[in-house]
């Protein structure tokens, strides 16, 4: 299992309700997480708006479908997962409300996302220095478009914002909508900067170790208050 999938999988498994049978993943990508959950014995339905991603998920045995949230409806679920997808979905209020309406009793909405608006100069200096270190060791592909945009700019924060201004919801907006469900909300910060390097890592054997070290450094430094963690996680606990 790739490190980034394991990182999300461990979070999701920690918060799945007891006797969780039916799971919906919104924004499944190529289906790696959904496949892992299916192997655990859960009935997983996975949707994505990209036909190629859905086809890839189907090839690994996932019940994946081309569909757009919140227009999709396939009965009730014990858990609805938004795996780095909710910041893209419009309208946000309807997306959250439909997820809540889709839950069975004691079901849960589990969200993994990122606070792109939280990036500051100090945090991005750490991010750039870490990426440059990996690049210097030959661990990163030189042609990764996003990383080259950030590394080539003298104003890193400006470059970051230019790459995250395409109608993306902020973590604060997501949190506000989740609070409107009138259910308890669990919140966690998490590592996420490592994901920007994930597709560029070229040293296959060491890939998971490299990304794990990247993520652990983000977690440690953010816990100390030295940087701001990028990842945000939310869990809605629906009452019986």
What is each of the regions a protein language model found here?
Residues 2-20:
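Conserved alpha-helix/loop element of class I SAM-dependent methyltransferases that forms part
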Residues 20-27, 110-143:
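Conserved class I S-adenosyl-L-methionine
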Residues 30-71:
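Class I SAM-dependent methyltransferase SAM/SAH-binding core
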Residues 81:
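A conserved beta-strand element that flanks and buttresses the S-adenosyl-L-methionine
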Residues 94-105:
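A short glycine-rich, Lys/Arg-flanked "PGG" loop and its adjoining helix->strand segment in the class I
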Residues 141-202:
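Substrate-binding/catalytic lobe of Class I Rossmann-like enzymes that use SAM or dcSAM, i.e.
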Residues 181, 188-240:
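C-terminal lobe and adjacent flexible extensions of AdoMet/dcAdoMet transferase-like proteins
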């Amino acid at each position: 299992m790739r490190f980034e999938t394991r990182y999300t999988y461990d979070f999701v498994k920690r918060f799945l309700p007891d006797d969780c049978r039916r799971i919906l993943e919104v924004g499944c990508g190529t289906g790696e997480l959904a496949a892992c959950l299916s192997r655990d014995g859960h009935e997983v339905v996975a949707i994505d708006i990209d036909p190629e991603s859905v086809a890839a998920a189907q090839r690994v045995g996932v019940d994946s479908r081309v569909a757009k949230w919140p227009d999709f409806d396939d009965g009730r679920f014990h858990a609805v997962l938004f795996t780095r997808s909710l910041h893209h979905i419009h309208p946000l209020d309807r997306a959250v409300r439909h997820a809540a309406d889709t839950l069975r009793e004691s079901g849960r909405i589990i969200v993994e996302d990122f606070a792109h608006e939280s990036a500051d100069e100090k945090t991005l200096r750490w991010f750039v220095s870490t990426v440059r270190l990996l690049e210097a060791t030959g661990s990163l592909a030189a042609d990764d478009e996003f990383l080259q945009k950030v590394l080539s700019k003298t104003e890193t924060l400006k470059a970051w914002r230019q790459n995250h201004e395409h109608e993306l919801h902020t973590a604060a907006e997501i949190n506000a909508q989740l609070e409107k469900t009138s259910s308890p909300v669990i919140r966690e910060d998490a590592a996420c900067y490592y994901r920007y390097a994930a597709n560029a890592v070229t040293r296959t054997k060491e890939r998971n170790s490299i990304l794990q070290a990247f993520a652990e450094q983000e977690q440690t430094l953010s816990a100390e208050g030295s940087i701001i963690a990028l990842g945000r996680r939310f869990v809605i606990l629906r009452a019986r």
